[in-house]
């Protein structure tokens, strides 16, 4: 069967599904870093809460200062943990960008009926995709800062609520970290652990699609159009379902990810006239005719 744009699409979609394994692995590593630091964090926070309880709680300025001091403490003790998380995410996404530039090119050229070398985006372009390309209107630095800030905000909300309802430090700690017999899944911190998957999947999808977009732009002589391909299942959003199969000029139109946990991808439509006709034989000519279209 001669190669065609359908073959390129199928291979890129299959690779996009495999990429979700990468995001799950990255999320596991993020959670492992957080979990490793949690016992010490839990003990030190409990000691601080014991001190606040011993001094008494009231809605006045003294308690307000203690709460501000507590939030600074939480940030200080959390900073090394999230610094390690951030470094892990950054380094793995940079490695992903470099790998996907080569993989994307190999997938496309592997389906062409002639020997053809694609132009690979420069290293600085790949790094810019990781660090400067917006993902859901935020760059990577903002995603990572928000991940830590939201974790801290949720903990402070639980502490304030616990103090207002006169809960013990043990009860407040349980609110945050959950019960050990349930693996902490009933605590507010579990939201942070689950959020690792959202962050990993959305950022890795952004890097993957950004690299493909750069690859198409670097080879616009043969990539004239792109097709939006959604992963169609029960989790597909209405917007991605409506865009599935839509064809756009190269570099124009909506670029995935267009929402949190987006799994869509844009695949190229190769113009056979830009590829050429070497080596010339009947099989190649037939395949090129399929690439050119009617």
Residue ranges and their predicted role:
Residues 1-186, 273-294:
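N-terminal leader/targeting and assembly helices and adjacent pre-domain segments
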